[in-house]
Amino acid sequence: AQIPQPQAAKASGPPETVVVSRDGTYDEVIRQQQVRPLSGTLDEVPVFNSNSPEIVQQEGILLSTFPPEGMASPEAHLNYAFQGRFDLFAHHIARGLNPDDRRTLFLAVVVYNPGPNPVELQINQAVSYLSQEAPFINLPEARLSINGNIFAGPGSRTASDLLRGVTQAHWPTSITIPPGNVSLLMNMPIPLRQLKIPLDGTYPQGEIIPKPPQQPVFLAAADGQLQQETLDGTAPVSPPSAPRPIPSNGRTTMMYLTSSGPIYLASLARYANTTASGNEQVPSLQDWLQLLKDGRLAGPRDMPPSDPATYQFGRFYYGRVAGVARGSSWKTTLTDSSASSTLTIPDPGNSFSYVISSVDRNTFGTGQIQSAPMIVRYPDTALRAHGNYGVRYSLRLPLYNSHDVAQTISIKFQTPLGDEGLTNGLRFRRPPENRIFFRGTVRLRFKNQMGIEQTHYLHLVQRRGQESNPLVTLTIPPQATKDVDIDLVYPPDATPPQVITVLNNSATDVFQAQSSRPFAHPTLSQDF
């Protein structure tokens, strides 16, 4: 795509930046610059990825890698054994069938040891949060998160904890699965009402969950409710009431695991049993095994994905993931080339960007699809692990100043508008759309002018088309190199892709964001 020329006003300074007014309501900003694929690749660590169906209203099998033999629905079992290091990612939402549906949905993960010897499953790190434990609150564009207490949404909080190395106290360090046995790894509620029991999976199997308090029922006139009549003998007309909301709640779980032998896993969803008195009971391991053996895939099923190889027109559906993906982390050092050990900074006023979490049909013109490939999957689920939710990106930028004078460099994390036709450029929107495309924490490591290592966690909230303020600004002496390390666990509440941009501020910064919202904190600098 060519940079649009009609009614375009060029900003001063290199490189060419075009600002186009769109109906007087917003400006579109097109900046010519390099957009680079990320060097390196995903590792080979398998990921148990349970995300379809996202909304669960019919109990059943979410994802099973068990062998299909002897199962009532063999097509629901993908026959994949884990051994050694692997990850687990599960994100599901419980939603009632109507405003009065307050049943408690439980989410379980069971582990089967098919071998003749005990298998130890080490839980290296594990976190799980409900929506009410991490509500979607309004946060500024960027905020320092010193203690990990800045988050918005369960995906944001879960990914932030993983990045910090946090494990919740209720998880064991390991479990041992006897030969030929099945064990529960987790058995957690996704409640649709306030429960007076622990919600972290520690409430024992078979224990009673008190039934909800009885709500008053108001009868309509047609059902015999008495209404006061008006003077003319007719009943007063009541104003229409607002529709009652459907109860909904979500849970996001991520784990880093290591198995001493081959094991099979399954994630399952079922409602708590109901007693004769109307109370509920926590499902037992036997309940889950019966569902695993006799059950079908949970529902309702998500929209099937579009096939990039045969897609021609209309809306492109990525689908949601249910299967085993290959790739848990992407670790690389960004350099000028494979033969170089440094990354030369751009000339004054120039910038270049690297794509993060690029997907089919949205790579910012690089053609690089970073989505993890699927080892096994259900036919109606995503062809790749689009978004790389839960994948850890670890990037080192050895920034080299080839100039004879000091240069001031800014690093930005940005959410451009998708445009596959734009070559060597990025497109933004001023102001950005109101839709939030990224909520998550980024870790920065660098040395200040005194050579002291600095580590900062920044929680970011970005909207579609947002240019953003710098994450950090550094002054690099002539002919010197400064390392900057950027780490993030790509959060489930985000919409990919994004870019990491290196900008030379030593000339007029025509790329500076213009946002109606004030920045929440000063840009980090090497003296911060």
How would you label these PLM feature ranges?
Residues 6-42:
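N-terminal low-complexity, Pro/Thr/Ser-rich intrinsically disordered segments
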Residues 13-24, 58, 64-124, 129, ...:
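Long compositionally biased, domain-poor regions of proteins
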Residues 27-79:
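Non-catalytic, interaction-prone regions of core transcription and DNA-replication machinery
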Residues 121, 128-156:
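Well-ordered mid-protein domain cores that form the structural environment of catalytic cofactors
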Residues 144-168, 173-175, 445:
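Low-complexity, serine/threonine/proline-enriched polar segments
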Residues 178:
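Internal, well-ordered alpha/beta segment that forms a basic, Gly-enriched binding/recognition surface
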